[in-house]
Amino acid sequence: MNTKIYRPALTLYKANAKGTGSAMKMELHPAHDQMSGCIMMSLASQKTVGDYRGPNPIYPTFDWENPITVKLDFIDLSKMLQVFRGEYESIEDGRGLVHRSPSGLTYVRLEHLVEPIPGYRLDVKLCDGVVIVEQRSIMLMPYEALGLVAAIESSLGVICFGVPMVENS
């Protein structure tokens, strides 16, 4: 029997007419064996501008070959949920999350905005020491944040405990 395995993912595309938009993909990685689960979050820059005129629209494209990707564990996701739920205006009073990796430091900042447009701004910066090497940002509307809250909350069980399996003996 062939079992097809897929990785659940949610992608939000935020293209604009200037070509400065971005997209965010959140991919669920359940806990297994002795490994904790996580959500791998990738942000990609917009590569091309779309053209919706005429009968054959041209859709914008995104640079998925060069995203900034960060692993969000249970604690990281819990801190993001606190901002989305309105318990805090930002993660760690604006300091955000800091992740160390062989490629440098990655900073993740999430803040609630009221003006000029209500929503949430998510910034991810990859730094080599103190120099910012790459940076991606995405603006999330309140309804997108609401959906993300539901998606993250429903993922926490498998992030913590994995997918229950019955072992055939």
What are these regions (language model features)?
Residues M1-S169:
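Positively charged, low-complexity terminal tracts
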